Regions:
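Short histidine/acidic/glycine/proline-rich micro-motifs that form metal-
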Residues: 23, 62, 115
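Structured helix-beta-strand junction loops
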Residues: 11, 80-81, 112
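Alpha-helical structural context
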Residues: 43-44, 81, 101, 131
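A metal-dependent, Asp-based hydrolase signature
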Residues: 1-56
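Asp-based, Mg2+/Mn2+-dependent phosphohydrolase catalytic module
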Residues: 76, 87-185
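Short, acidic loop-to-helix structural element flanking the phosphoryl-transfer center
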Residues: 26-34, 47-86, 96, 122
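A general structural motif at alpha-helix termini
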Residues: 8, 12, 58-61, 143, ...
Length: 185
């Protein structure tokens, strides 16, 4: 199951990155998760999955994510001195549901769903800085994915890499070693 879950994650991510480059996005992360899951089910002859199973995997599971255990206690401390925002390819609804489940309080939430341009497009990052009335050089992008941080850095953001070696289970993350150009590792 771990391999299938990671394949679902990989393909859903691929379906989202750079969305909105040529035309307005036709789906959000929830939609991508569902159509990718249906592809994987078909490719692996897993037709035993019911519509309820598909809904539970594609929708309910990501809307019930539990965040990293060290994060809820540290978020309020960061907010004492900084604007702390969620900037994500996930749907607004996933962010709302997971924030409630994990008792997270953000200063602001930015979903690429509302911007109409998805990461890794430069416009997504630049738009967030503009909405915050900040220069890109005043923004720090914190993530555990080099590809996201590299894109943020390319438009002028400062970057911080957080190691999350268990994020992908036994398989390990696709890019476990931070790019040495990040500002904080």
């Amino acid at each position: 199951w771990g391999l299938l879950a990671n394949e679902l994650r990989r393909r859903s991510l691929k379906a989202m990155l750079n969305l909105g480059d040529k035309e307005p996005p036709q789906y959000n992360f929830d939609g991508a998760h569902e159509f990718v899951l249906r592809e994987i089910i078909k490719e692996n002859n897993l037709e035993k999955f019911s519509e309820e199973d598909i809904h539970n995997i594609a929708y309910k599971a990501p809307h019930s994510f539990i965040c990293w255990e060290d994060f809820p206690d540290n978020l309020p401390k960061l907010r004492e001195n900084y604007m702390v925002c969620s900037f994500t390819i996930l749907s607004y609804r996933i962010i709302i549901d997971t924030a409630k489940k994990n008792n997270l309080s953000w200063d602001c939430v930015f979903s690429c769903e509302g911007i109409g341009k998805y990461k890794l497009l430069p416009e997504a990052y630049i738009t967030v800085a503009k909405m915050l009335q900040l220069n890109v050089s005043e923004c720090l992008m914190v993530a555990c994915h080099n590809f996201d941080l590299d894109a943020a850095k390319s438009v002028g953001f400062k970057t911080a890499f957080v190691r999350r070696p268990d994020e992908w289970g036994e398989e390990g993350p696709p890019d476990p070693n931070p790019n040495p150009d990040h500002d904080i590792i």
